[in-house]
């Protein structure tokens, strides 16, 4: 069996926002790739890998994935944090990649084999107003999508208003548009009414609330959009208030997809066991990789909850590959969010996931089936890149009085 000889973090994309983990072994040419990307704290994740996890694993048998996962999980003593789980997730994916290459099989075959011929996916349609949104939805339908996420005016979906139209106090904080919950509660049902009038019931829609509402208003929104038969409403309530999903479930039949910010098993376990959600939406890398997510999927299957692993603009092709291999093998798969990578980004990742119409197709090569051209990865960084000057905090929204809106 292959022994781990080194673990390297390869930064790529503009400003180094992607971190690809490369686990090397003592077998000639045998290595694995994983995703440990964190657009807001990339260097912190790299430090965890290089200073804590890599020294733990060098010399260990790469085949013992579960034992290595538990070793990484417990060796920092404090656990269940986003940065640690991202670091673990990147290494875990790489170990599964190695195992697939050793076996000569795609990872989904190691997870039990194919449950489906391809992976249904959804894209992101948006616009500053309903006219632009309808135009974008038409484009996605023409591309073959049957499920589409719809946002109007950003994550606020019509809830952002110009400052000159808002009642702003003196010495107001911030300078951009402000988020108004009542405007949002009016705009979103109206948006879906117009979309259904335009497109009928032949296409399914999702919408991302991004935890911008108070729990009571989230329940109101879920009730108001019921007539429009959403595929799901995403992250209606912030993780700090997940107990409110009990009240939401009692009052609305709108399907709920939850978990983009989840990293701790205690955040999803009760929601799944009490059947308060319909889709679990953790990010594969943030939850601890393939090993963690196959356990989440098994728990979810027992309680009738489906998977909808989170992707999004800051995710990389390796994370998407890991998600799709899970999707192929999980019976209770629901839908997969798709990433729209630039041509030059795809060019750096040979074997990236292919999309045809509304379906994703994994590589049939051994492992995750994806390879990184390190020269092209370096070129994606751009000129003058320096990890020491990187600073990219999440851009927060505010209400009219200056109160921060929780993302």
Curated annotation (Swiss-Prot):
SUPFAM superfamilies (alphabetical): Enolase C-terminal domain-like, Enolase N-terminal domain-like
Xref: InterPro entries: DgoD-like (IPR034593), Enolase-like_C_sf (IPR036849), Enolase-like_N (IPR029017), Enolase_C-like (IPR029065), Mandel_Rmase/mucon_lact_enz_CS (IPR018110), Mandelate_racemase_C (IPR013342), Mandelate_racemase_N_dom (IPR013341)
Ranges annotated as spanning the membrane: none
The keyword Protein biosynthesis is annotated on this UniProt entry: no
Binding site for Mg(2+): 208, 234, 260
Function: Has no detectable activity with D-mannonate and with a panel of 70 other acid sugars (in vitro), in spite of the conservation of the residues that are expected to be important for catalytic activity and cofactor binding. May have evolved a divergent function.
This protein's name: D-galactonate dehydratase family member Pjdr2_1176
Originating species: Paenibacillus sp. (strain JDR-2)
């Amino acid at each position: 069996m292959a022994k781990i000889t080194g673990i390297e973090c390869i930064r790529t994309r503009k400003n180094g926002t992607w971190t690809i983990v490369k686990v090397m072994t003592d077998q000639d040419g045998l290595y694995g790739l994983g995703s440990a990307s964190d657009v807001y704290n990339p260097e912190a994740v790299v430090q965890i890998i290089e200073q804590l996890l890599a020294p733990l694993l060098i010399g260990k048998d790469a085949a013992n994935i579960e034992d290595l996962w538990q070793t990484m999980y417990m060796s920092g003593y404090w656990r269940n944090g986003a940065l640690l789980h991202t670091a673990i997730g990147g290494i875990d994916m790489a170990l599964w990649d190695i195992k697939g290459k050793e076996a000569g099989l795609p990872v989904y075959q190691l997870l039990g084999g194919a449950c489906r011929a391809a992976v249904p996916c959804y894209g992101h349609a948006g616009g500053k107003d309903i006219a632009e949104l309808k135009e974008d939805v038409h484009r996605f339908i023409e591309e073959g999508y049957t499920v589409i996420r719809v946002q109007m005016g950003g994550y606020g979906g019509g809830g952002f208003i110009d400052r000159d139209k808002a009642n702003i106090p003196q010495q107001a904080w911030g300078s951009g548009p402000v988020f108004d919950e009542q405007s949002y509660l009016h705009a979103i049902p109206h948006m879906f009414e117009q979309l259904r009038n335009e497109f009928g019931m032949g296409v399914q829609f999702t919408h991302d609330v991004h935890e911008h509402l108070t729990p009571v208003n989230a329940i109101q929104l879920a009730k108001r959009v019921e007539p429009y038969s959403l595929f799901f409403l995403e992250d209606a309530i912030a993780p700090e208030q997940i107990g409110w999903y009990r009240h939401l479930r009692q009052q609305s039949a709108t399907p709920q997809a939850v978990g983009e910010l989840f990293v701790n098993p205690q955040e999803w376990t009760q929601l799944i066991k009490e059947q308060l959600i319909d889709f679990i939406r953790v990010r594969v890398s943030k939850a601890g990789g393939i090993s963690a997510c196959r356990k989440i999927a098994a728990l979810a299957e027992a309680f009738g909850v489906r998977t909808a692993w989170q992707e999004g603009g800051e995710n990389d092709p390796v994370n998407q590959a890991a998600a799709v291999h899970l999707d192929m093998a999980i019976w209770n798969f629901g839908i997969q969010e798709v990433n729209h990578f630039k041509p030059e980004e795809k060019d750096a990742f040979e074997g990236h996931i292919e999309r045809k119409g509304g379906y994703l197709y994994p590589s049939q090569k051994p492992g995750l089936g994806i390879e990184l051209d390190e020269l092209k990865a370096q070129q994606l960084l751009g000129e003058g890149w320096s990890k020491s000057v990187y600073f990219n905090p999440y851009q927060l929204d505010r209400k009219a009085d200056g109160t921060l809106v929780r993302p």
